[in-house]
Amino acid sequence: MRINHNISALKAGNHLGRTNTALTKSLEKLSSGYRINRASDDAAGMAISRKMRTQIAGLEQASRNAADGISVIQTAEGALAEVGSMLQRMRTLSVQAANGSNTNDDRKAIQEEIDNLTQEIQRVSETTEFNTKTLLNGDIDRKSYSDTSTVRIVDMSDTVANADYRISVTANASQATVTGVTSTFWSSSASTISPAQAGKLNINGTEIEINAGDTRDVVFEKIRNACEINNINASMGADQLTLTTKEYGTSSKINIICDSNLTAVLGLPASANQSGTDAKVTLLAPAANNAFTSTATVSSDGKKVTVTDHGNFEMVFEVNADEPPSTPPITPPYTVNFTVLDAGPMQLQIGANKGQTMDVRIPRVDPETLGIENVNLVTEAGAQKGISLYDAAVTKVTAIRAKLGAYQNRLEHSISNLDVTHENMSEARSRIEDVDMAKEMANYTQKNVLAQAGTSMLAQANQRPQTILSLLQG
């Protein structure tokens, strides 16, 4: 027997130390609920679970992002629904105005409502917002830039590629104009119509009675009112009268029939039939810096020029877009370069990782892009044209709403997928990180018994050297 080294006590102490360490870890696992509380518990498992934790947090936020995207789309779609209702009302008013039973005053009243609804559509375009971000003014659509202020892209279809485009403007759009010859009648406010000069003046089907005794200002007011009905501006110079249509293009016309006894005093021709002209644009030959194809076609309506091609390609320009014109004015022919690029779409982060995004594009929706900014229903012809214009506008708004609906459906499916992925990844992380409570309780019980036994055995081992005393005492 040896007393300098108590090997039994050393062994019991070592075992007790290991048992206490294991017992401490078991207590930590049971109290935290985690199998891995530090990297030393499972280095590989710790690395994997931390990556999973990052992904799970990202998936949760991506799901919320997609839900926010749905809210944006619902806000825009709700505004467009109201725009569609207004367009339906405007079309109904056009049908009403086209009826021959209406008087000029009736059509003026109809036009008053049309003008107010047009202004309201413009207001909706400018003020529909989500979280201070304007939705319908084109800010979250693709952008286009040109190298001149005289031509700009008003609208383009989704099939227009991001590229450079070149056109040549060969003629600007013009208004119909009738300029009277000089007449002393317009020079003085004291001028009056004599009985021999009285007669009738017809402007685009609106007849005016010029009576004896009418002063210059009374005559001008009658002419101005008739012109206003027909969307024509009347201006009185120092000694002559000028009539100019408000609209541009071949559809803008001034037809005048003037009694012979009025022609000299008013300075107007006995008859006149003037029309405006449409803008003329030529697409430059396809080249490296021009994305138009050889099959693209061009049509003009006043200042608006539409380029169409295969695959529902459509691009609408406005020529003479700078009003007042630039100084010095740019006169045709001249070349315009455009660039279309993805600079504006709203990018939604709908995934946990970089690049997992979705672009949402909402085009500009206002009277100009809908083609209804200058609808005039004060004549039957204008009312008939209004029906066609509002039909086209309703179709366009419906198409935009359909696209927004497709966006919303996609986002709803994205949310479902994100939530399922989140669920499965959380379950996988749980299998790696979480402790099996039943198994760990059994382990804890075992270690606890061993600790108690180890403590007892260590005490016994420490008592063994005492037996040497009995030998010495014997």
Pin down the residues of each PLM region.
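Primary detection of the long, small/polar-rich alpha-helical "axial" segments characteristic
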Residues: 1-474
